[in-house]
């Protein structure tokens, strides 16, 4: 499969079938459970803030593999796993979950547009190579997780769950925890499983299919 087949355009090939829907459903369930466990197992003292949010290490590969479906997986996991199951009221969990899009949409855009220009795989399968790892480290680990920490904590601040004077600590803890999870788990999943996922025809070539 050629790298240039990946873009942000509508691409109905391969068509959406039962096996793909099952794959996305399983991924959503996995991310939801891991998101919930991450929040309750290693809490920071603020609702839905984890000291080590391991779920992000899974979500980044899901977004790079499944494109728009990865966004859906992220929103479901954030609303249900990190939100409702963690004790957040439903009316607040829904907008909290959609904040995930603010992080994951730019990530996919950068990988699908700038990745090939820098000679990097748009689905992250070259993270075990120097160029691919450095690109992933800058885009997926450092910048994306900083943005996640800022936007997520700002939403919790608006909800009244994180006081203003605690924002610097909460943002820093969120950022560091996410970076560790993505750098370790995300790198391994992308490097080991991306060729398999692509070979099975499960990667999404356009924005959604």
Model region roles, listed by residue range:
Residues 4-6, 24, 28-32, 36-62, ...:
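Membrane-embedded alpha-helical hairpins and interfacial helices in multi-pass inner-membrane proteins
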Residues 71-72:
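Nuclease catalytic cores that cleave nucleic-acid phosphodiester bonds
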Residues 12, 16-30:
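Non-catalytic interaction surface on structured domains
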Residues 1-17:
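Short, Lys/Arg-rich, polar N-terminal cytosolic tail immediately upstream
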């Amino acid at each position: 499969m050629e790298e240039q087949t990946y873009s942000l355009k509508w691409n109905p090939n391969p068509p959406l079938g039962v096996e793909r829907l099952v794959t996305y459903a399983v991924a959503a369930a996995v991310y939801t459970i891991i998101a919930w466990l991450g929040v309750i197992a290693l809490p920071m003292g603020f609702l839905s803030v984890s000291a080590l949010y391991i779920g992000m290490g899974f979500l980044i590969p899901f977004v790079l593999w499944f494109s728009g479906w990865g966004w859906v997986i992220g929103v479901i996991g954030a609303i249900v796993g990190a939100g409702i199951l963690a004790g957040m009221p439903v009316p607040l969990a829904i907008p909290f979950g959609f904040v995930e899009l603010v992080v994951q949409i730019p990530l996919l855009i950068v990988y699908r547009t700038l990745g090939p220009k820098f000679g990097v795989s748009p689905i992250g399968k070259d993270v075990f190579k120097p160029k691919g790892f450095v690109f992933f480290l800058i885009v997926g680990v450092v910048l994306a997780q900083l943005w996640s920490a800022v936007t997520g904590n700002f939403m919790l601040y608006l909800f009244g769950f994180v006081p203003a004077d605690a924002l610097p600590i909460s943002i820093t803890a969120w950022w560091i925890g996410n970076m560790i999870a993505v750098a370790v788990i995300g790198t391994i999943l992308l490097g080991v499983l991306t060729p398999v996922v692509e070979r099975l025809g499960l990667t999404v070539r356009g924005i959604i299919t």
